[in-house]
């Protein structure tokens, strides 16, 4: 890639009304791909996540991860002049993304029907827990609410215990990625038709889309089959799950055509003749017995890596179950910039995830930056609305423009780690 090559979405402008994770993930991806993302922050505290993660000198690691590659516009929308400024920007905006509860953005005066009259080419994406329509749409919700409504939470955990909650924002991040994909498709459609459109993304829909197997099975066999939690084993494939080894755990999967390789690695090829293990269906029914056999073999190795080496020699699909810090230090992850090192003037050097897809024309950016609240007010308003220095000064004096705020360090001591439940 040469320095002169334009970034993929260069020239597209995004107005970002998002907060927490799902919405910011969508707009952050657009920003990474070159769009000019203008994040609207409506108070000196800004996005709630500015107070989460490690906070130092007005910057939060949580905020940085989900909001780099954006410019911050601090504006008080309770003041009529603040709303007027943003409405005046709409003709020059390509994409608007928001993740308020359904109806809130319209109540603020920025609903799609109103904005499309100002700019028919506008692509607008709303992200919520359960969508903009339907009986559940007005319920408040976060990531885990979408998972529960989609029938996903019930499938997680041990069969004789309560369902579990993953300690990561799977639904938020996945919905943000899906929304960014949809925005890209809508922009492509606009290039062909000249018209924008409205996109309705939800955590519930994204979670439901993740069901691998059981949706058509349940609909074809109503009342005859009920998926059950299966703990660390896959409910419909065997062997497929987490197995205990000396000094750790191994994720191991062997489909029918791979079973001979697994049994060769184990030195027990005759097990294929055992009726309990001859087919996938029989192995699923006898999962506990097969697990005992596999873990008994794994116990003969001095450590996990030795067992994996034996499996690798037969090309049996397997992997060590790595702790997060082990994954972050893995040379493969570093080499692909799946883990990438960035720098902030307050936080110093630290790691964030890379892009989920690698592009041949230009690599993941590492010179990314996150803005303080209102840091880019003057530049944004001069570029888009040609606001004069005199008028900018008046807007600050009237409290319409907000600048200099950050996560409240009186509430969050510098360097502390503060975590809240994942919120869409």
Which residue ranges define each predicted feature?
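N-terminal helix-loop segment corresponding to the beta1-alpha1 unit
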Residues: 1-192, 219, 225-226, 372, ...
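Glycine-rich beta-alpha junction loops
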Residues: 44, 129-131, 203-208, 247-249, ...
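A short glycine-threonine-serine/GTX helix/turn-capping micro-motif
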Residues: 163-174, 196-198, 229-240, 249-251, ...
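Substrate-binding/catalytic subdomain of NAD(P)-dependent oxidoreductase enzymes
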Residues: 187-230
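Beta-strand segments within the central parallel beta-sheet cores of soluble alpha/beta enzyme folds
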Residues: 196-204, 310, 392-396
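Aromatic-enriched alpha-helical interface/lid elements that frame and gate functional surfaces
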Residues: 225, 233, 239-314, 318
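A glycine-rich dinucleotide-binding beta-alpha-beta segment and adjacent secondary-structure elements
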Residues: 313-366
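C-terminal active-site "lid" helix and adjoining low-complexity regulatory extension at the edge
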Residues: 350-389
């Amino acid at each position: 890639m040469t320095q002169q090559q334009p970034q993929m979405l260069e020239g597209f402008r995004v107005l970002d009304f998002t907060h927490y994770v799902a919405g910011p993930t969508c707009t952050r991806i657009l920003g990474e791909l070159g769009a000019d993302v203008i994040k609207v922050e409506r108070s000196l505290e800004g996005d709630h996540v500015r107070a989460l993660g490690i906070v130092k000198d007005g910057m939060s690691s949580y905020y940085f991860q989900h909001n780099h590659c954006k410019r911050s516009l601090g504006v008080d929308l309770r003041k009529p002049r603040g709303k007027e400024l943003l409405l005046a920007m709409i003709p020059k905006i390509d994409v608007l993304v928001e993740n308020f509860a359904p109806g809130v953005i319209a109540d603020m005066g920025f609903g799609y029907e109103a904005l499309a009259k100002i700019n028919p080419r506008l692509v607008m994406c709303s992200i919520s827990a359960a969508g903009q329509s339907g009986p559940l749409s007005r319920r408040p919700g976060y990531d885990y609410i979408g998972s529960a409504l989609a029938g996903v939470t019930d499938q997680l955990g041990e069969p004789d215990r309560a369902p579990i909650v993953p300690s990561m924002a799977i639904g938020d991040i996945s919905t943000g990625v899906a929304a960014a994909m949809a925005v890209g498709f809508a922009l492509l459609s606009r290039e062909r038709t000249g018209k924008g459109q409205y996109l309705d993304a939800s955590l519930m829909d994204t979670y439901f889309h993740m069901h691998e197997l059981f949706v058509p099975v349940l609909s074809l066999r109503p009342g005859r089959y009920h998926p059950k939690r299966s703990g660390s084993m896959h409910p419909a494939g065997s062997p497929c799950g987490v197995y205990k080894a000396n000094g750790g755990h191994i994720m191991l999967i062997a489909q029918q055509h791979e079973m001979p390789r697994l049994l060769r690695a184990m030195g027990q090829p005759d097990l294929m003749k055992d009726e309990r293990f001859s087919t996938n269906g029989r192995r699923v029914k006898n999962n506990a017995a097969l697990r005992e056999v596999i873990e008994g073999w794994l116990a003969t190795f001095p450590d996990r890596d030795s067992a994996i080496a034996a499996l690798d020699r037969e090309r049996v699909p397997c992997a060590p179950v790595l702790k997060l810090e082990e994954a972050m230090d893995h040379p493969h992850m570093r080499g692909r910039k799946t883990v990438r090192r960035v720098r902030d003037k307050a936080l110093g050097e630290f790691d964030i995830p890379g892009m989920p897809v690698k592009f041949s024309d230009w690599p993941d950016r590492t010179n990314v930056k996150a803005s303080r609240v209102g840091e880019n007010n003057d530049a944004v308003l001069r570029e888009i609305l040609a606001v004069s220095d005199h008028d900018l000064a008046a807007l600050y004096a009237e409290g319409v423009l907000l600048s200099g705020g950050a996560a409240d360090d009186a509430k969050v001591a510098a360097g502390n780690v503060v975590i809240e439940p994942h919120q869409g």
